Protein backbone atom coordinates (compact mmCIF):
# COMPACT_ATOMS: atom_id res chain seq x y z
CA UNK A 1 0.00 0.00 0.00
CA UNK A 2 1.38 3.37 -1.03
CA UNK A 3 1.76 6.15 1.53
CA UNK A 4 -0.46 8.45 -0.53
CA UNK A 5 -3.27 5.86 -0.46
CA UNK A 6 -2.91 5.46 3.29
CA UNK A 7 -3.02 9.22 3.88
CA UNK A 8 -6.14 9.51 1.72
CA UNK A 9 -7.73 6.65 3.65
CA UNK A 10 -6.95 8.37 6.95
CA UNK A 11 -8.62 11.52 5.65
CA UNK A 12 -11.76 9.54 4.81
CA UNK A 13 -11.59 7.68 8.14
CA UNK A 14 -11.39 10.92 10.10
CA UNK A 15 -14.45 12.28 8.31
CA UNK A 16 -16.35 9.05 8.91
CA UNK A 17 -15.45 8.72 12.59
CA UNK A 18 -16.02 12.40 13.39
CA UNK A 19 -19.48 12.29 11.79
CA UNK A 20 -22.12 11.57 14.48
CA UNK A 21 -23.25 7.95 14.65
CA UNK A 22 -24.18 5.29 17.23
CA UNK A 23 -20.64 4.96 18.63
CA UNK A 24 -20.23 8.74 18.93
CA UNK A 25 -23.58 9.06 20.67
CA UNK A 26 -22.61 6.30 23.11
CA UNK A 27 -19.33 8.07 23.86
CA UNK A 28 -21.25 11.30 24.54
CA UNK A 29 -23.76 9.55 26.77
CA UNK A 30 -21.10 7.77 28.82
CA UNK A 31 -18.98 10.92 29.06
CA UNK A 32 -21.90 12.73 30.66
CA UNK A 33 -22.62 9.78 32.96
CA UNK A 34 -19.14 8.65 34.07
CA UNK A 35 -16.67 11.16 32.61
CA UNK A 36 -14.61 11.27 29.40
CA UNK A 37 -11.85 8.97 30.67
CA UNK A 38 -14.20 6.15 31.65
CA UNK A 39 -16.21 6.69 28.47
CA UNK A 40 -13.17 5.62 26.46
CA UNK A 41 -13.62 2.08 27.80
CA UNK A 42 -16.76 1.74 25.70
CA UNK A 43 -14.78 3.13 22.76
CA UNK A 44 -12.22 0.35 23.27
CA UNK A 45 -15.06 -2.17 23.04
CA UNK A 46 -16.27 -0.48 19.88
CA UNK A 47 -12.80 -0.71 18.38
CA UNK A 48 -12.64 -4.43 19.16
CA UNK A 49 -15.97 -4.87 17.41
CA UNK A 50 -14.64 -3.02 14.37
CA UNK A 51 -11.78 -5.52 14.11
CA UNK A 52 -14.32 -8.36 14.10
CA UNK A 53 -16.37 -6.66 11.39
CA UNK A 54 -13.23 -6.01 9.37
CA UNK A 55 -12.38 -9.71 9.48
CA UNK A 56 -15.80 -10.58 8.09
CA UNK A 57 -15.43 -7.95 5.37
CA UNK A 58 -11.93 -9.21 4.55
CA UNK A 59 -13.20 -12.76 4.02
CA UNK A 60 -15.66 -11.56 1.42
CA UNK A 61 -13.16 -9.20 -0.16
CA UNK A 62 -10.62 -12.00 -0.59
CA UNK A 63 -13.15 -13.95 -2.65
CA UNK A 64 -13.88 -10.92 -4.83
CA UNK A 65 -10.20 -10.22 -5.45
CA UNK A 66 -9.51 -13.84 -6.31
CA UNK A 67 -12.42 -14.38 -8.69
CA UNK A 68 -13.33 -11.23 -10.57
CA UNK A 69 -11.42 -8.06 -11.40
CA UNK A 70 -14.64 -6.60 -12.80
CA UNK A 71 -16.52 -7.23 -9.56
CA UNK A 72 -13.65 -5.62 -7.66
CA UNK A 73 -13.90 -2.46 -9.78
CA UNK A 74 -17.69 -2.40 -9.41
CA UNK A 75 -17.30 -2.63 -5.64
CA UNK A 76 -14.86 0.28 -5.73
CA UNK A 77 -17.42 2.27 -7.69
CA UNK A 78 -20.10 1.35 -5.16
CA UNK A 79 -17.83 2.57 -2.37
CA UNK A 80 -17.37 5.97 -3.97
CA UNK A 81 -21.11 6.33 -4.55
CA UNK A 82 -21.77 5.28 -0.96
CA UNK A 83 -19.61 8.15 0.29
CA UNK A 84 -21.66 10.55 -1.81
CA UNK A 85 -24.86 9.04 -0.39
CA UNK A 86 -23.59 9.48 3.17
CA UNK A 87 -22.69 13.07 2.38
CA UNK A 88 -26.15 13.90 1.07
CA UNK A 89 -27.77 12.23 4.08
CA UNK A 90 -25.51 14.10 6.49
CA UNK A 91 -26.14 17.41 4.69
CA UNK A 92 -29.90 17.05 5.01
CA UNK A 93 -29.76 16.12 8.70
CA UNK A 94 -30.79 18.91 11.07
CA UNK A 95 -30.59 17.06 14.38
CA UNK A 96 -28.31 18.05 17.24
CA UNK A 97 -25.77 15.38 18.09
CA UNK A 98 -26.06 16.08 21.81
CA UNK A 99 -29.83 16.31 21.85
CA UNK A 100 -29.92 12.80 20.34
CA UNK A 101 -27.44 11.27 22.76
CA UNK A 102 -29.02 8.02 23.97
CA UNK A 103 -29.85 7.45 27.59
CA UNK A 104 -27.95 4.35 28.61
CA UNK A 105 -30.32 1.99 30.34
CA UNK A 106 -29.18 1.07 33.81
CA UNK A 107 -26.67 3.85 34.34
CA UNK A 108 -23.18 2.49 33.83
CA UNK A 109 -21.24 1.77 36.99
CA UNK A 110 -18.00 3.80 36.85
CA UNK A 111 -16.17 0.79 38.31
CA UNK A 112 -17.59 -1.70 35.79
CA UNK A 113 -14.95 -1.97 33.08
CA UNK A 114 -16.64 -4.87 31.30
CA UNK A 115 -20.06 -3.26 31.29
CA UNK A 116 -18.72 -0.21 29.48
CA UNK A 117 -16.63 -2.41 27.18
CA UNK A 118 -19.63 -4.57 26.28
CA UNK A 119 -21.69 -1.47 25.46
CA UNK A 120 -19.18 -0.36 22.84
CA UNK A 121 -18.76 -3.88 21.46
CA UNK A 122 -22.51 -4.34 21.14
CA UNK A 123 -22.95 -1.01 19.35
CA UNK A 124 -20.31 -2.03 16.79
CA UNK A 125 -21.60 -5.55 16.17
CA UNK A 126 -25.27 -4.57 15.94
CA UNK A 127 -24.77 -1.74 13.45
CA UNK A 128 -25.99 -3.20 10.13
CA UNK A 129 -24.28 -0.43 8.15
CA UNK A 130 -20.80 -1.18 9.49
CA UNK A 131 -19.90 -4.24 7.42
CA UNK A 132 -21.48 -2.66 4.32
CA UNK A 133 -19.38 0.45 4.87
CA UNK A 134 -16.16 -1.52 5.42
CA UNK A 135 -16.78 -3.67 2.34
CA UNK A 136 -17.54 -0.59 0.25
CA UNK A 137 -14.75 1.68 1.53
CA UNK A 138 -11.74 -0.62 1.84
CA UNK A 139 -11.56 -1.67 -1.86
CA UNK A 140 -10.77 1.94 -2.71
CA UNK A 141 -7.40 1.52 -1.00
CA UNK A 142 -6.60 -2.18 -1.49
CA UNK A 143 -3.75 -2.92 -3.92
CA UNK A 144 -4.49 -6.10 -5.93
CA UNK A 145 -1.62 -8.58 -5.89
CA UNK A 146 -0.50 -7.68 -2.37
CA UNK A 147 -1.52 -9.64 0.77
CA UNK A 148 -5.10 -8.68 1.57
CA UNK A 149 -4.86 -9.59 5.27
CA UNK A 150 -1.95 -7.23 5.89
CA UNK A 151 -3.65 -4.37 4.07
CA UNK A 152 -6.90 -4.91 5.96
CA UNK A 153 -5.01 -4.96 9.26
CA UNK A 154 -3.31 -1.64 8.47
CA UNK A 155 -6.56 -0.03 7.33
CA UNK A 156 -8.57 -1.35 10.28
CA UNK A 157 -5.96 -0.27 12.83
CA UNK A 158 -5.87 3.19 11.27
CA UNK A 159 -9.68 3.38 11.26
CA UNK A 160 -9.93 2.33 14.91
CA UNK A 161 -7.29 4.89 15.88
CA UNK A 162 -9.30 7.61 14.13
CA UNK A 163 -12.45 6.40 15.89
CA UNK A 164 -10.79 6.54 19.30
CA UNK A 165 -9.58 10.07 18.58
CA UNK A 166 -13.08 11.13 17.52
CA UNK A 167 -14.70 9.60 20.61
CA UNK A 168 -12.18 11.29 22.90
CA UNK A 169 -12.86 14.61 21.20
CA UNK A 170 -16.65 14.33 21.45
CA UNK A 171 -16.58 13.00 25.00
CA UNK A 172 -14.63 16.01 26.22
CA UNK A 173 -16.49 18.49 24.04
CA UNK A 174 -19.90 17.23 25.12
CA UNK A 175 -18.89 17.56 28.75
CA UNK A 176 -17.78 21.16 28.29
CA UNK A 177 -20.09 22.49 25.60
CA UNK A 178 -23.30 20.49 25.94
CA UNK A 179 -25.58 23.51 25.67
CA UNK A 180 -23.77 25.03 22.70
CA UNK A 181 -23.72 21.75 20.75
CA UNK A 182 -27.46 21.39 21.23
CA UNK A 183 -28.13 24.66 19.37
CA UNK A 184 -30.00 23.77 16.12
CA UNK A 185 -28.13 26.30 13.99
CA UNK A 186 -24.69 25.07 14.98
CA UNK A 187 -25.74 21.44 14.66
CA UNK A 188 -27.01 22.14 11.14
CA UNK A 189 -23.75 23.87 10.18
CA UNK A 190 -21.71 20.95 11.52
CA UNK A 191 -23.80 18.42 9.57
CA UNK A 192 -23.47 20.40 6.35
CA UNK A 193 -19.70 20.72 6.67
CA UNK A 194 -19.35 16.95 7.19
CA UNK A 195 -21.86 16.19 4.43
CA UNK A 196 -20.14 18.42 1.92
CA UNK A 197 -16.78 16.87 2.71
CA UNK A 198 -18.22 13.36 2.20
CA UNK A 199 -19.56 14.30 -1.23
CA UNK A 200 -16.28 15.89 -2.31
CA UNK A 201 -14.30 12.83 -1.22
CA UNK A 202 -16.68 10.51 -3.02
CA UNK A 203 -16.41 12.53 -6.23
CA UNK A 204 -12.62 12.63 -5.93
CA UNK A 205 -12.53 8.83 -5.65
CA UNK A 206 -14.65 8.56 -8.80
CA UNK A 207 -12.22 10.86 -10.63
CA UNK A 208 -9.24 8.82 -9.48
CA UNK A 209 -10.94 5.68 -10.76
CA UNK A 210 -11.63 7.27 -14.15
CA UNK A 211 -8.00 8.30 -14.56
CA UNK A 212 -6.64 4.87 -13.71
CA UNK A 213 -9.22 2.79 -15.62
Predicted segments with their positions:
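Juxtamembrane transmembrane-helix termini in multi-pass membrane transport proteins
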Residues: 3-73, 136-155, 160, 171
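Short loop-to-helix capping motifs
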Residues: 21, 35, 127-128, 183
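Primarily residues marking transmembrane-helix entry/exit sites
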Residues: 2, 6, 109-117, 130, ...
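Core segments of transmembrane alpha-helices
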Residues: 123-135, 195-198
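Juxtamembrane helix-capping/reentrant segments at transmembrane boundaries
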Residues: 35-44, 106-108, 119-122, 183-186, ...
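Hydrophobic/aromatic residues within the transmembrane alpha-helices of Major Facilitator Superfamily
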Residues: 14, 18, 51-55, 88, ...
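Membrane helix-loop-helix hairpins that form the core translocation module of multi-pass transporters
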Residues: 37-115
Amino acid sequence: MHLSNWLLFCSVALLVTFSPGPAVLLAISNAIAVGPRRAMISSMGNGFGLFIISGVAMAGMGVVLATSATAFMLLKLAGALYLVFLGIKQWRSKASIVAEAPVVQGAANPNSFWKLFRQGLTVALTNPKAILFFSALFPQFITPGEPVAIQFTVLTTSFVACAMLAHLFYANLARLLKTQLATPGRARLFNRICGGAFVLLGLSLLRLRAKTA
